[in-house]
Regions:
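Acidic, proline/glycine-rich low-complexity IDRs
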Residues: 2-4, 104-154
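Negatively charged, low-complexity tracts enriched in Asp/Glu with abundant Ser/Thr
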Residues: 2-66
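Long, C-terminal folded domains that constitute the functional core of proteins
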Residues: 24-25, 55, 95-97, 149-154
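A cross-kingdom feature marking charged/low-complexity
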Residues: 35, 64, 73-91, 145-154
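Short aromatic-glycine-(Arg/Gly/Cys) micro-motifs in beta-strand/loop hairpins
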Residues: 41-44, 50, 70-109, 139
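Intrinsically disordered, low-complexity boundary segments flanking structured domains
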Residues: 55-58, 67-70, 99-102, 122-123
Length: 154
């Protein structure tokens, strides 16, 4: 399954550094489809490709905490939901939320739950972590979500 970027531009799912490609095409004025439809979310997860979603921020000790959910295939019959909470350490030219300081140093990669189905993982993310349908992105695009929501001036 290819990722449709608009104007008939298709990108193979094997493309790495998707956020670099998206930024390049966006700079060329190519309209991009950032958010995945429900079918793409379940299809990606069933095929072993991760999806992510930026959640509303919160504050801890007067510092903004960036929150995002990642859903990934843990093994052949299990899917992992991960809640990542990191301090907003971003700066112009540094928007890699994966590298930001973790809120909880004992869980640098977030808190994880495992489910035996894609539907179970998505239902938990929706009901407990308050994700929204239609707001999932492919892995690697969460940085763009972060920049656009919290620091559009960069």
């Amino acid at each position: 399954m290819a990722l449709c970027l608009g104007r008939g531009i298709l990108v193979a799912p094997e493309v790495t550094n998707a956020h670099l490609l998206v930024n390049f095409l966006n700079g060329m004025g190519v309209p991009l489809q950032r958010y995945l439809c429900d079918l793409d979310v379940t299809g990606n997860l069933s095929a072993g490709r991760d999806v992510e979603q930026l959640l509303p921020d919160r504050y801890e000790l007067d510092q903004r905490v960036i929150r995002f959910v990642s859903i990934e295939q843990a093994n052949l019959n299990a899917w992992r939901v991960r809640l990542c909470e990191v301090f907003d350490n971003g700066a112009p030219g540094f928007i890699d939320v994966y590298e930001f300081e973790a809120l909880d140093p004992d869980h640098p990669f977030g808190t994880e739950w495992t489910f035996d189905s894609v539907d179970g993982a998505l239902r938990f993310a929706r009901d407990v972590l308050r994700t929204s349908q239609g707001r999932y992105v492919n892995q690697g695009l969460i940085q763009d979500e972060y920049k656009d929501r919290y620091h559009p001036e960069w």
